[in-house]
């Protein structure tokens, strides 16, 4: 099952409240800091019972998922405006859509859904939930989520969160 591997990845994600005026700057900064966070917090090179070539197997494995869409990890460029943010997030495939009260697979870009159905904020929120950049705005919650750190040993379980918040 293509989705099964999601059940065995573990990251240490931090969400914090963010205002509209600072959202893009902090989103761009969070993505820029991803390699540093990974370098300082990676501790999971094992995947599927074998040593992977990555210091963080989760980051390495997820990087291959629809890589051309930049669905995971860092984006190829910073966001320049909220319009640019929405336009960029509308390019990837709308993986899972809601139709007639049911959740169904989809294989078309999200912009195509918008073209056919008009503005649809609820659909956008559902779509952006399945885009896993190292830092991502969570519009439904008014937060920025920074997500590339591996889970830390219990004695240091707050270290990654403190680092991310401090940055």
Predicted regions and their residues:
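Residues forming anionic-ligand binding surfaces in small-molecule and nucleic-acid pockets
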Residues: 3-13
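C-terminal accessory/tail domains of diverse enzymes
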Residues: 5-6, 20-167
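Short cationic amphipathic helices and targeting signals
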Residues: 12-17, 146
């Amino acid at each position: 099952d293509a989705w099964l591997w999601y059940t065995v990845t573990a990251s240490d994600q931090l969400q914090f409240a963010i205002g509209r005026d600072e959202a893009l700057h902090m989103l761009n900064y969070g993505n820029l800091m991803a390699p540093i966070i990974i370098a300082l917090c990676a501790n999971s090179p094992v995947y599927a019972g074998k040593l992977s070539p990555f210091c963080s197997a989760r980051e390495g494995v997820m990087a291959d998922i629809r890589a051309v869409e930049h669905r995971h990890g860092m984006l190829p460029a910073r966001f320049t405006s909220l319009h640019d943010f929405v336009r960029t997030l509308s390019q990837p495939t709308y993986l899972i859509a809601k139709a007639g009260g049911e959740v169904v697979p989809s294989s078309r870009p999200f912009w195509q859904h918008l073209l056919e159905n008009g503005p649809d904020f609820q659909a956008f929120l559902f779509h952006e939930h399945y885009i896993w950049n190292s830092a991502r705005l969570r519009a439904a919650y008014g937060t920025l989520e920074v997500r590339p750190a591996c889970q830390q040993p219990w004695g240091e379980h707050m270290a990654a969160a403190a680092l991310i918040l401090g940055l």
